[in-house]
Amino acid sequence: MLQDRGFQVKTGTIVDATLIGAPSSTKNADKARDPEMHQTRKGQQWYFGMKLHIGVDSQSGLAHSAVVTSANVHDKHPLPDLLHGNERRVYGDSAYASQKALIQGKAPNALDFTNQRTRKAGCEVDEVQRAKNRNKSKIRARVEHVFAVVKRLWGFDKVRYRGLAKNATRAFVTLAMANIYLARGPLLQQVRA
């Protein structure tokens, strides 16, 4: 629908992932947690649930690909499924920093614009690299807008069903609604014209 209205995937992709919580309680009929959900640590905080990985167009800010995994899967593993192959630039946080070969394999013309680590063991902070990362993060912020709509506006910050399959379907529908919501201005202008 959006491609019919002139919205198309351009030449850049921003990749990122977010945690979607699941109940870790065993106070249910089965006396067990959901076997497809797992726990992971982010900083010093532990989470139980799944991850929603998305690829967002760097110009329009609309999601074009998504993968759902359990929370213990590292962000780099679903990276090939998030790229469409025609990218000229790939943006990501430092979780994707060492994936240059994987990016080149899926999108041969793509330049790697992932944030690099600024602190090496026993070394000073690299201020030049920190400034480069800050500029890349201004573009990467577009993926966070999609997550904000999915989690805050549509309420998908916790899973509703057991298992990844049903929750993946809900995630994909929510992303489709988020795309329509984020593109509402130009879509309404076309309708009014």
Feature annotation, model-predicted:
Residues 88-89, 94-169:
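Helix-centered, glycine/charged polyanion-binding patches within enzymatic domains
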Residues 59, 155, 181:
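Residue-level marker of positions within ordered structural domains that often coincide
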Residues 130, 153, 187-193:
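A short, flexible helix-boundary coil/loop motif
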Residues 79, 87, 128, 150, ...:
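Generic structural signal of hydrophobic/aromatic residues within well-ordered alpha-helices
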Residues 1-108, 115-117, 172-178, 193:
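Polybasic low-complexity intrinsically disordered regions
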